[in-house]
Regions:
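Conserved class I S-adenosyl-L-methionine
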Residues: 70-80
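S-adenosyl-L-methionine
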Residues: 111-134
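A short SAM/SAH-binding and catalytic strip from SAM-dependent methyltransferases
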Residues: 140-152
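A short, conserved alpha-helix within the catalytic core of class I
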Residues: 149-161
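Conserved beta-strand signature within the Rossmann-like core of class I S-adenosyl-L-methionine
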Residues: 165-177
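Glycine-rich SAM-binding Motif I of class I
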Residues: 82-86
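Conserved SAM-binding motif I beta-strand of class I
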Residues: 96-101
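Conserved Class I S-adenosyl-L-methionine-dependent methyltransferase catalytic core
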Residues: 1-69
Length: 223
């Protein structure tokens, strides 16, 4: 869960990019500086936060490459305080998001944030309950959190995706090599081979906006 302030974030450039590439999403989202927002700034005539702009780019990537997002059932692994679920359901009212996280404090924050925002098309699910979801999950998303986990912590999530037979997986890693986390702060082994081992094949890869490059990856489960 991101709770810091990244002072080098290119707010103005990102607003210009989002206004050019995803105007509907940018117009649909507002920032009031309330729960979950550590820094709100005025840029290019709009009050924004890093989380708002990142959400525009992430949802825009899914819109371009995943058919049926408007009515998809989404599993958000590492949901944090719930900002992705809030903004996905705000821009796609027919979608539904299951929010899960291995940290209990994140799930508590997520529940309170959803209640504060009046989000009705999302629900918090404890990790041990995810495999019991009976509705079909169309896509799972993991935005940065697996880069903060060990391979041993990632594996159970992938096993759960196997159980649920989730056809698509979107991952936004910290680094292009999908480095995992280690206790001493050094880069751990890549978790990309584990994704492949569970039958997922990379079908879309995008390096993100020039002003804030990162890796957006969409995988499809092989038949």
């Amino acid at each position: 869960m991101y709770l810091g302030c990244q002072t080098d974030y290119p707010y103005a450039d990102m607003v210009r990019y989002c206004r050019r590439e995803h105007p509907r999403l940018l117009d649909a989202f507002t920032e009031d500086g309330a729960l979950g927002c550590t820094v709100a700034v005025a840029a290019e005539g709009k009050t924004v936060s890093r989380d708002l702009l990142d959400s525009v780019v992430e949802i825009g990537f899914l819109e371009r490459h995943l058919v049926g997002l408007s009515c998809a059932r989404v599993l958000d692994i590492g949901a944090g305080y719930g900002r992705f679920a809030h903004r996905l359901t705000a821009s796609h009212p027919g979608a539904f998001v299951y929010c899960t996280d291995r940290f209990a404090v994140s799930l508590t924050c997520c529940e309170r944030y959803m209640a504060h925002r009046g989000v009705t098309r999302a629900m918090v699910v404890r990790p041990q309950q995810v495999a019991s979801i009976t509705e079909r999950i169309d896509v799972a998303v993991n935005i940065h959190s697996w880069s903060e986990c060990t391979p041993e912590e990632i594996e159970p999530w992938l096993e759960t995706l196997d159980q649920l037979n989730v056809p698509y997986l979107m991952v936004v890693p910290h680094t292009p090599d999908f480095a995992s986390w280690t206790a001493n702060g050094a880069a751990g082994p890549s978790f990309l081979p584990a994704i492949h081992a569970h039958g997922y094949v990379l079908i879309r890869h995008w390096r993100g906006p020039d002003c804030w490059p990162r890796d957006f990856c969409l995988f499809e489960r092989a038949a």
